[in-house]
Regions:
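Metal-dependent de-N-acetylase/amidase catalytic core
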Residues: 1-131
Length: 131
């Protein structure tokens, strides 16, 4: 699941959408919420990066390599004619997150060569089999 940051003073509808996503997740994994119905499980909820991450109290903890789909993403961004001022902003951001991806996947020690990446903030703890 993906949604907006928890807090966004410029787009309050974004915060509301995240609250709805969190409620849907809660219901999907709640034993006894709807007796007789299958429990769907508890997927992670990732919050994608807002325009002003430092104002939204958003901190990335997950990076996704989007190099293979960057051209399509850039073309999609350019479809929003009213936000032309953000086209280069998002290109620069994807390149910066690509650097974060490379550094956190091993960097000079054999890290994966992502040119473009996106950052996400996970809401819930993740489970692992080993550290």
């Amino acid at each position: 699941m993906m949604s907006h940051s928890h807090y966004d003073p410029y787009n309050t509808d974004h915060s509301y959408a995240t609250k709805v996503a969190m409620e849907c997740r809660m219901i999907a994994q709640a034993w006894g919420h709807n007796p007789g119905e299958k429990v769907l499980g508890a997927p992670q909820l990732y919050l994608f990066e807002p325009h002003q991450s430092e104002q939204m109290q958003w901190k990335p903890d997950t990076f996704l390599d989007i190099t293979d789909v960057w051209d399509k993403k850039r073309a999609a961004i350019e479809c929003m004619q009213g936000q032309e001022h953000l086209w280069n902003f998002y290109t620069n951001l994807a390149e910066n997150r690509g650097n974060h991806f490379r550094r956190n996947s091993g960097g000079m020690a054999g890290g994966r060569p992502a040119r473009y990446a996106e950052g996400f903030q996970s809401v819930y703890p993740r489970t692992v089999d080993e550290l």
